[in-house]
Each structure stands twice: as structure tokens, then as C-alpha cells.
């Protein structure tokens, strides 16, 4: 794919690597709001929506846009854009641009979109890619001038052993590995737990 953005080599590009819960998204939000305009592409609609809500609370409803495959909220005065990666209006010029979970460039179904953003999407002043360390060598080959920072996990994640679903505490996570298992778990937990979110 040819480089669309004249991928300015003078644009400050960074890659922040680390596992979940290392403060990468919080850092990206702080960086974006320090610029006059910005855009962040998230891998999930729920992440775009959650961070859109946070930004609205900080800078106000009129300055923040939400663009996903399902909904578009774009005020006339919008300066900050929260999008799914596929829905990012990359032709729009912004000072800051960020793509979250950039390692999804290796995904068989959605990877082409993340790869396109990695190669072509740039902020005019700063570009930030967030992801796990598995993408590090690819970034170094494709973007040799990209500064790479690694972050440690802010809390511990540990296996608590086998638990009955009926005895789960609030804010527990259930991880399943197939679509049928997901729906079976959700239908069962709806009977025993008052609220549940499926991500």
C-alpha cells in the first residue's frame, strides 16, 4: 500500500508497549487533550464509548465526537474524536493521532485496517501506537525512527482457582474461548447475577 499521508518523518512517533492495565490509554488521553485536536482509534466500540464519555466530562459535549460502525455523534465544534479503528476518519487533519492495540495488525480478519493505520495514519504533531510487546520487532522494521517505550503492569493479575459462577464477586471477569461457550455462560449467569456485560 502506498503511503497516503506523506508519513511525515518529522512527526513525533512513539509506540507504548505493555500488557493490559499499564496506563497506556490514560496516558494517550492525557497526551491528546494537551493538543488542540486529536483522534484515538480503539479496537472495540465499548472502549471508544467509555473514553468518549470520559472526555466529555473533561472538555464538554460540544468538543468531543464519537464515530463507530453503529453510531456517529459529531458536533460542529468537535476537536477530539473517539472511534473504532475501522471508522477513523483518517483524512481529517488532527494534531494528535493514536491507535490502540496496534498488535492487531497481525489479526487475520481485521489486521489490514490496523496495518493501514500503522503505515499511513499520522497526527500532524504527534502519533502514538499502543499495544503489546509482540508487535515490537515489526514496528522497528517498518518505522525505524519510532521511539518505543515499555510499561509495566500497574496491578497483579492472578488465577483465583475454580469458582462457582453463582459465587462470583462483583466486577469479576469470566473468560471463555468459543462463541457457543460465551452465550452458554451469559444465559446461565443472567439467572444468577443481576447485571452482566458481554464484551
Give a label for each model feature:
Residues 38-47, 169-186, 191:
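Conserved strand-helix element at the start of the C-terminal RecA-like helicase core
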Residues 58-90:
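Inter-Walker segment of RecA-like/P-loop motor cores
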Residues 25-37:
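Walker A/P-loop NTP-binding motif
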Residues 79, 93-96, 124-128:
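Loop/turn-to-beta-strand initiation segments
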Residues 107-155:
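Post-DEXD/H (motif II) to motif III coupling segment of the RecA-like Helicase ATP-binding lobe
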Residues 100-102:
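Walker B catalytic acidic pair
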Residues 13-26:
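Walker A/P-loop
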Residues 1-4, 8, 12, 190, ...:
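Single conserved hydrophobic/aromatic residue that forms the stacking wall/gate
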Amino acid at each position: 500500500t502506498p503511503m497516503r499521508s506523506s508519513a511525515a518523518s518529522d512527526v513525533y512517533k512513539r509506540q507504548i508497549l505493555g500488557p493490559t492495565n499499564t496506563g497506556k490509554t490514560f496516558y494517550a488521553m492525557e497526551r491528546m487533550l494537551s493538543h488542540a485536536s486529536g483522534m484515538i482509534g480503539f479496537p472495540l466500540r465499548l472502549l471508544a464509548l467509555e473514553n468518549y464519555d470520559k472526555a466529555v466530562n473533561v472538555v464538554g459535549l460540544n468538543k468531543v465526537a464519537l464515530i463507530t460502525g453503529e453510531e456517529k455523534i459529531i458536533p460542529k465544534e468537535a476537536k477530539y474524536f473517539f472511534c473504532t479503528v475501522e471508522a477513523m476518519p483518517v483524512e481529517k487533519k488532527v494534531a494528535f493521532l493514536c491507535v490502540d492495540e496496534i498488535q492487531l495488525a497481525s489479526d487475520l480478519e481485521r489486521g489490514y485496517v490496523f496495518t493501514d493505520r500503522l503505515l499511513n495514519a499520522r497526527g500532524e504533531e504527534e502519533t502514538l501506537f499502543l499495544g503489546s510487546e509482540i508487535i515490537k520487532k515489526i514496528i522497528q522494521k517498518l518505522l525505524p525512527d519510532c521511539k518505543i517505550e515499555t510499561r509495566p503492569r500497574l496491578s497483579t493479575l492472578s488465577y483465583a482457582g475454580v469458582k462457582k459462577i453463582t459465587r462470583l464477586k462483583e466486577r469479576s471477569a469470566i473468560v471463555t474461548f468459543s462463541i457457543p461457550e460465551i452465550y452458554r455462560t451469559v444465559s446461565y449467569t443472567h439467572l444468577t447475577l443481576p447485571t452482566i456485560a458481554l464484551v
